[in-house]
Swiss-Prot record:
Entry keywords, A to Z: 2Fe-2S, 4Fe-4S, Biotin biosynthesis, Iron, Iron-sulfur, Metal-binding, S-adenosyl-L-methionine, Transferase
Positions bound to [4Fe-4S] cluster: C65, C69, C72
S-adenosyl-L-methionine among keywords: yes
Family: Belongs to the radical SAM superfamily. Biotin synthase family.
EC number: 2.8.1.6
Protein name: Biotin synthase
Gene Ontology biological process: biotin biosynthetic process
Residue ranges annotated for the Radical SAM core domain, each copy included: 47-276
Oligomer and partners: Homodimer.
Cystine pairings recorded for this chain: none
Source species of the chain: Bacillus licheniformis (strain ATCC 14580 / DSM 13 / JCM 2505 / CCUG 7422 / NBRC 12200 / NCIMB 9375 / NCTC 10341 / NRRL NRS-1264 / Gibson 46)
Co-factor: note: Binds 1 [4Fe-4S] cluster. The cluster is coordinated with 3 cysteines and an exchangeable S-adenosyl-L-methionine. Binds 1 [2Fe-2S] cluster. The cluster is coordinated with 3 cysteines and 1 arginine.
Length: 333
């Protein structure tokens, strides 16, 4: 038995991954990556079988953000040519939900740019979510930024199932990425969402000049935060942002990152998120041996893979899509 299978068996028996072992996953020799992914798959299979959760993003508000996040094309310091608009209307949010439902996508993610939502914007989301729940029954994830007192409770009451607010990077690396809010601001928002009864979703962006130790710290921080869902983004550097031209990733390293997050967060939903197409490239399918969830369609300001291609990929792997009906049943358990 190889070292990765031994580690997987220990994790499945309730054991922890040490700091040294976590770093060794990221430093796995390229020739051994298939062995590593096979071991990660044993953990993934225990908790999720061969099911894949599908998620779709609605970019409900674009640009116009006062924050200075170095990776983001919507930030105040970005010169990227993007569409900027205020919160879309209810009809547009409902049309997006219908499209998700028709494509058998169980989770609909309403995402808005900005530091955090105004109470009026929360009103708009609340109004739309109530009708989406009644009409389509989708799982709703909201990603609206830092929350003010009372906003999380209103979203929960309206039917929002999950709230996303990514930590993005390690606490050590945070000030290299943004200075307009703190790492603790992000953690506190996830805790606020959790206290309201919404399922906490928080993830990372890998490839922002962080060290391997930073990546290990991210995975362990999300374990401590007890995030139910962990989106793992890989930097898609956009022209006009401070991280323009940064390209530190390769497909094999991205697979190692996904394996690390599965080993450290064995029971959690690990989602391959933004940047998978440009960073994993032809190795995208292998990522699902560690992860059990993907975004389908476009991201916020970058294009994703065609939905048909995603379904073909899952079929070719012998994996099964978690249907809308299965997702509804899971919400009732």
């Amino acid at each position: 038995m190889n070292q990765w299978m031994e580690l997987a068996e220990r994790v499945l028996d309730g054991g922890e991954v040490t700091e040294k072992e976590a770093l060794s996953i990221l430093e796995c020799p390229d020739d051994d990556v298939l062995l590593l992914m096979h071991a990660a798959f044993q953990i993934r299979k225990r908790y999720y079988g061969k099911k894949v959760k599908l998620n779709m993003i609605m970019n409900a508000k674009s640009g116009l953000c006062p924050e200075n996040c170095g990776y983001c094309s919507q930030s105040s310091i970005s010169k990227a040519p993007i569409d900027s608009y205020r919160m879309v209307d209810k009809t547009t949010l409902l049309e997006g939900a219908k499209r998700a439902h028709d494509l058998n996508i169980g989770t609909y993610c309403i995402v808005a740019s900005g530091r955090g939502p105004s109470n009026r914007e929360v009103d708009q989301v609340v109004d739309a979510v109530k009708e989406i729940k009644e009409t389509y029954g989708l799982k709703i994830c909201a990603c609206l930024g830092l929350l003010k007192p009372g906003q999380a409770e209103r979203l929960k009451e309206a039917g929002v199932d999950r709230y996303n607010h990514n930590i993005n990077t390690s606490k050590t690396n945070h000030s290299n990425i943004t200075t307009s809010h703190t790492y603790d601001d992000r953690v506190n928002t996830v805790e606020t969402a959790k206290k309201s009864g919404m399922s906490p979703c928080s993830g990372v962006i890998v490839g922002m000049k962080e060290t391997k130790q930073d990546v290990v710290d991210m995975a362990k921080s999300l374990k401590a935060l007890d995030a139910d869902s962990i989106p793992v983004n890989f930097l898609h550097a956009i022209d006009g942002t401070p991280l323009e031209g940064v390209n530190e990733l390769n497909p094999l390293y991205c697979l190692k990152v996904l394996a690390l997050f599965r080993f450290i967060n064995p029971t959690k939903e690990i989602r391959i998120s933004g940047g998978r197409e440009v960073n994993l490239r032809s190795l995208q399918p292998l990522g699902l041996y560690a992860a059990n969830s993907i975004f389908v369609g476009d991201y916020l300001t970058t294009a994703g893979q065609n939905e048909t291609e995603d379904h073909k990929m899952l079929h070719d792997l012998g994996f099964e899509v978690e249907s809308v009906e299965e997702m509804k049943a899971s919400l009732q358990r």
